[in-house]
From Swiss-Prot:
The keyword Repeat is assigned to this record: no
Source domain of life: Eukaryota
Family, as annotated: Belongs to the FGGY kinase family.
Coiled-coil positions: none
Sites where the protein binds ATP: 33-34, 302, 345, 445
Tissue: Expressed predominantly in sebaceous glands.
Biological source species: Mus musculus
Reactions catalysed according to its record: glycerol + ATP = sn-glycerol 3-phosphate + ADP + H(+)
InterPro entries linked to this entry: ATPase_NBD, Carb_kinase_FGGY, Carb_kinase_FGGY_CS, FGGY_C, FGGY_N, GK5
A Pfam family assignment: FGGY_C
Protein's name according to its UniProt entry: Glycerol kinase 5
Record localization: Cytoplasm
MF annotations from Gene Ontology: ATP binding; glycerol kinase activity
């Protein structure tokens, strides 16, 4: 071939390339409790560009946890722009945005002006702890439980059984919103004037992205607020009436994978479709491809969340695990049962602030350098103790400290406490959920710690699959968005794209840990009811 022919061939190839449509991508964004992160995904589910910023929580008083909405909005916009730039693509190549968020963190704002009345009140916030205790011990709750137990006896209704076991929690938005109405007159007045909007982070971001033209949430987020009736698939008139919250301030509830509207062009230069809103744990479940009944996900991030796919049916539980909507896509409805421990990554970050180590990655080697923690035990309870103990007044503590205790013992005790809490949650799942476990898949930043992963596998005597990609909430949001716009054909295609990095198998028997865990449980019991004011 002559030089002239070669040049002509190259020109034809260049023209052909320029004529072909540009590659398409989807965005998966997760607003976690610690980090806000965005990934750009191609059609092989490979991350092409990323950006992350630390979520700056505000602590106005002990036990209060807030997020500045203006700061969060600036971070949200920045990580999307930076991720797209890092991917080396253009905004007009983004065909869909999926948003995963920490759940039950809420805000209220002026319906007419869009201005917020206060900061986001985090799901970790404990300002309503006394209100929760008061309500759970109230005559109203005792009458409700008694009446529904009788009704369940005669009707065998699952709804009545669930209501008979219902208790308020500080993690629900319910009584934190009640606290706001009792203490912020501006919000109370706006509610009375029908000028107040309530929203979890997903709802507020959608409202901001669409310049107020879209106001909605999805079923996964709604089901974690404490206001939602998952049996009737609507906001609960019973709960809202009990706590005097008008239904009018709650947003419409839509499918998880759904066209919620397009981003206002002024924000990113193009109208990117917002096609998925999802709670972070449900999103991680979807990202892990836990699509079958019995599939289990163990997320270890800021907190630990253990979820099991219960199929189309909600599980009526005994107050440890709680029923949730996993996702709703058209006619497909998937339900979950979930249990959680509030302080996992939180405990590790706290230890880092104390200069016990400089990088969380060091903790694995520190723990493995010792035979044991030398009788030191840590209770991870900065935000109270969740199921099966359910004590918002518990305190975080070290017990068993000695002259010989050093930072290595403290670090190992912290990591062991995470594994012990995992064991408690898994045992509770086995007791309460009458569904055989098929697979266990882990995700979240703490699952990068092989010491915690191996100890958890030993304690529960099960294999645990760790994926190649840890940011499952981002991937789940992107997957849901991709399905909505035809970027991926179906869930079967997503399953084929999933990659496993390592499977942890039990190496020690439970009996080798039994005495250690019994002593840890003693430490936990001594930390309970510490902040009780009555």
């Amino acid at each position: 071939m002559s030089g002239q022919q070669e040049r002509a061939e190259r020109q034809r190839e260049e023209l052909s390339a320029s004529a072909s449509p540009p590659s398409r991508f989807v965005l998966g964004l997760d607003v976690g409790s610690t980090v806000i992160r965005c990934h750009v995904y191609d059609q092989t589910a490979r991350v092409r560009g990323s950006s992350a910023q630390k979520v700056e929580n505000v602590y106005p008083q002990p036990g209060w946890v807030e997020i500045d909405p203006d700061s969060l909005w600036a971070q949200f916009v920045a990580v999307i722009k930076d991720a797209v730039k890092a991917a080396g693509v253009q905004m007009n190549q983004i065909v869909g945005l999926g948003i995963s968020t920490q759940r039950a963190t809420f805000i209220t704002w002026n319906k007419k002006t869009g201005h917020h009345f206060h900061n986001f009140i985090s799901w970790q916030d404990l300002r309503a702890a006394e209100l929760v205790k008061s309500w759970n011990n109230s005559l109203i709750m005792k009458l409700l439980h008694g009446a529904t137990r009788v009704l369940h006896f005669f009707s065998r209704s699952k709804v009545m059984l669930t209501v008979s076991r219902f208790n308020f929690s500080t993690q629900h938005a319910t009584l934190r919103l009640t606290w706001i109405l009792q203490n912020l007159s501006e919000v109370k007045r706006a509610v009375e004037e029908d000028n107040c909007c309530f929203g979890t982070i997903d709802t507020w971001l959608l409202y901001k992205l669409t310049k107020g033209s879209s106001y909605a949430t999805d079923y996964s987020n709604a089901s974690t607020t404490g206001f939602f009736d998952p049996y009737a698939m609507r906001w609960s008139r019973l709960i809202t009436t009990m706590v005097s919250i008008p239904l009018s301030i709650l947003p419409p509830v839509k499918d998880t994978s759904y066209n919620f509207g397009s981003v206002d062009e002024k924000i990113f230069g193009v109208p990117i479709p917002v096609v998925a809103l999802v709670g972070d744990q449900q999103s991680a479940m979807f990202g892990e491809c836990c699509f079958e009944t019995g599939d289990v996900k163990l997320t270890m991030g800021t907190g630990t969340f253990l979820d099991i796919n219960t199929g189309k049916n909600l599980q009526h539980v005994n107050g440890g695990f709680y029923p949730l909507i996993g996702w709703k896509i058209g006619q497909e409805l998937v339900c979950l049962a979930e249990g959680n421990a509030g302080d996992t990554g939180t405990a590790i970050m706290w230890a880092q602030k104390l200069d016990l180590f400089t990088d969380a990655a060091e903790t694995e080697k520190m723990a493995l350098s010792l035979e044991d923690s030398e009788g030191v035990y840590f209770v991870p309870s900065f935000s109270g103790l969740q199921a099966p103990l359910n004590d918002p007044c518990a305190c975080a503590s070290f017990m068993g400290l000695k002259h010989s205790t050093n930072k290595y013992h403290l670090v190992r005790a912290i990591l062991e406490s995470i594994a012990f809490r995992n064991k408690q949650l898994y045992d509770m799942l086995q007791r309460e959920i009458q569904i055989p476990v098929t697979n266990i898949r882990a995700d979240g930043g703490v699952c990068n710690n092989a010491f915690v992963m191996q100890m958890t596998s030993d304690l529960i005597n099960e294999k645990i699959d760790r994926p190649a990609h840890f940011d499952m909430s981002c991937l789940g949001a992107a997957s849901l968005a991709g399905l909505a716009v035809g970027f991926w054909a179906d869930k079967e295609e997503l399953q084929k794209l999933r990659q496993s990095e390592m499977v942890f198998k039990p190496q020690k028997k439970w009996q080798e840990y039994e005495v250690n865990m019994e002593n840890w449980v003693k430490a936990v019991k001594r930390s309970m009811n510490w902040y009780n004011k009555t």
